[in-house]
């Protein structure tokens, strides 16, 4: 097991990348941008222990849904929720990203390079399905997207 400040790759493989928390400075910038508001619902792919969800739901008052495939890390997010001041606005789901059907309320989506391009393609198909079910303005936020992500996103959006 490789450990680096906050990083956990115990269950990482070629498809699902190691857990690494987003720096608070990045979350502060996103939270202060005005792009996420109280009426929005944020979906955090690869939520890990819930940092993005707790911080942005507190800062912006939005509802946040974090999905995580790793049951051990998911359990830590649920444990963290017990002491969070924004717990009533945060939900977690343990599921593989490509199998998750987006709720029609989701209109903000956050990625910190959580998985392979193969999985991203399937996730983007799910996002499009949700959009066609209920057309709405949606914003996707990518923190440190890989070159593969960038090349794909330039052709699919």
What are these regions (language model features)?
Residues 3-37:
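S-adenosyl-L-methionine
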Residues 39-46:
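Conserved class I S-adenosyl-L-methionine
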Residues 50-54:
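Glycine-rich SAM-binding Motif I of class I
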Residues 63-68:
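Conserved SAM-binding motif I beta-strand of class I
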Residues 77-78:
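Conserved SAM-binding loop
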Residues 87-95:
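Conserved SAM-binding strand-loop segment of SAM-dependent methyltransferases
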Residues 108-119:
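A short SAM/SAH-binding and catalytic strip from SAM-dependent methyltransferases
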Residues 118-157:
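C-terminal substrate-binding/active-site "lid" region of AdoMet-derived donor-dependent transferases
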């Amino acid at each position: 097991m490789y450990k680096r400040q906050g990083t956990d790759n115990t269950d990482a493989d070629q498809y699902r990348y190691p857990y690494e928390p987003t720096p608070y400075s990045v979350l502060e910038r996103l939270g202060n941008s005005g792009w996420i508001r109280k009426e929005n619902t944020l979906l955090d792919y690869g939520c890990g222990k819930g940092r993005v969800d707790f911080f942005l739901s507190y800062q912006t008052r939005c509802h946040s849904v974090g999905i995580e495939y790793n049951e051990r890390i998911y359990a830590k997010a649920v444990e963290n929720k017990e002491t969070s001041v924004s717990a009533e606005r945060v939900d977690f789901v343990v599921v593989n990203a490509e199998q998750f059907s987006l709720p029609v309320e989701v209109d903000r989506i956050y990625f910190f390079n959580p998985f392979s391009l193969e999985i991203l393609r399937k996730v983007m198909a799910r996002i499009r399905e949700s959009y066609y079910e209920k057309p709405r303005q949606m914003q996707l936020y990518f923190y440190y997207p890989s070159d593969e992500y960038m090349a794909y996103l330039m052709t699919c959006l």
